[in-house]
């Protein structure tokens, strides 16, 4: 791996992204009703990329994708709990896809009609056996990776447009958290269905709470890693402000989804003013991309706690300007370890209750 040039991995990444996105087109939008596309179609991308890195020919790569079809998984129910399984979906997709490719490279075969067959992936996870004509349109002429989104906030993407609207209104009108009487966020279907959580009790729930994230943006200035640390989750200013944030379904925005992921935000200020914004795109989307500096800032924020700041800077420089991959990195933590999940033994035993636990 240390001698691997940059062209082959780049080709593998582009191909993996292309395969997963086109399979996603074939099964959407009905697939998203029960399935999380990152965990499902992401598996096909990982299988394709790994197969190409391993030097598989077209037949072996096809078997990698076929085997990935039976490995793919990731349920929408994971979004609707305080559990940690949802963030595991991308890791599982990468692991399962890589395993499928390693097996294919060694001669393991899959059902080559696993995607489109009558009881295959599309039939099992969407409303039909797949919109393959639509999925294959423009193949080789346009590439999905050129229209990718970089996440600019550390929470659910269905909240992004609302957060961008609040940030723009704050910059334009100069108000702070203490000036806000109420916030109303109108969104499309998943914004309401997945992210209308007025009383989140855990880090995972907070990442899917539009109310919490809007309040955290106003109080902390951003919604990145620090917004989900224990101190932020217990911050009385965020708690109080989040109770004044309402979320509703906007029919116009719902009709435009998934082609457009927008938000309409109205902020009522204590001085009597009401300011509003229709946020038609999200920062980080193809039509509003992050700058190179913003991407570097995000990379460093995520990488430095794992490999250390000097190594993160060197790695970024190598990825930007080098003609070969930097090789395997020792993932030695340079920062204090993240808190462990509370031990079950430390909790007093309580009778089961049908009520959800209180948030704070």
Question: Where are the model-predicted features located?
Answer:
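Glycine-rich, mobile lid/loop segments that gate access to catalytic sites or pores
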Residues: 3-99, 106, 111-119, 124
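Terminal-appendage/accessory-domain detector
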Residues: 85-95, 102-360
């Amino acid at each position: 791996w240390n001698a691997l040039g940059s062209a082959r991995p780049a080709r593998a990444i582009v191909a993996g992204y292309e395969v997963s996105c086109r399979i996603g087109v074939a099964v959407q939008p009905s697939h998203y009703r029960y399935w999380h596309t990152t965990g499902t179609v992401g598996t096909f991308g990982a299988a394709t990329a790994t197969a190409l890195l391993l030097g598989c020919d077209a037949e072996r790569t096809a078997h990698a994708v076929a085997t990935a079809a039976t490995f793919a998984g990731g349920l929408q129910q994971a979004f609707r709990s305080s559990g940690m399984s949802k963030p595991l979906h991308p890791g599982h997709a990468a692991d399962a896809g890589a395993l499928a490719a390693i097996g294919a490279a060694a001669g393991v075969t899959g059902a080559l009609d696993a995607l489109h067959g009558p009881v295959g992936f599309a039939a099992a996870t969407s409303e039909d056996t797949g919109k393959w004509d639509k999925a294959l349109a423009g193949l080789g002429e346009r590439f999905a990776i050129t229209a990718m989104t970089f996440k600019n906030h550390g929470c659910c993407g269905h909240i992004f447009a609302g957060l961008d609207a609040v940030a723009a209104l704050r910059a334009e009108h100069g108000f702070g958290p203490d000036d806000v009487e109420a916030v109303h966020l109108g969104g499309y279907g998943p914004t309401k269905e997945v992210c209308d959580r007025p009383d989140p009790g855990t880090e995972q729930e907070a990442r899917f709470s539009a109310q919490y994230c809007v309040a955290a943006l106003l109080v902390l200035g951003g919604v990145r890693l620090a917004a989900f640390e224990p101190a932020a989750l217990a911050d009385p200013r965020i708690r109080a402000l989040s109770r004044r944030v309402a979320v509703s379904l906007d029919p116009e925005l719902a009709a435009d989804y998934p082609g457009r992921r927008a938000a309409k935000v109205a902020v009522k200020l204590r001085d009597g003013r009401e300011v509003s914004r229709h946020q038609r795109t999200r920062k980080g989307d193809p039509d509003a991309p992050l700058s190179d500096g913003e991407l570097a800032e995000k990379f460093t924020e995520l990488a430095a706690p794992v490999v250390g700041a000097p190594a993160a800077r060197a790695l970024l420089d190598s990825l930007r300007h080098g003609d070969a991959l930097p090789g395997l990195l020792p993932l030695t933590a340079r920062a204090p370890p993240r808190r462990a999940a509370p031990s079950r033994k430390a909790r007093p035993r309580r009778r089961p209750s049908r009520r959800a636990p209180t948030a704070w």
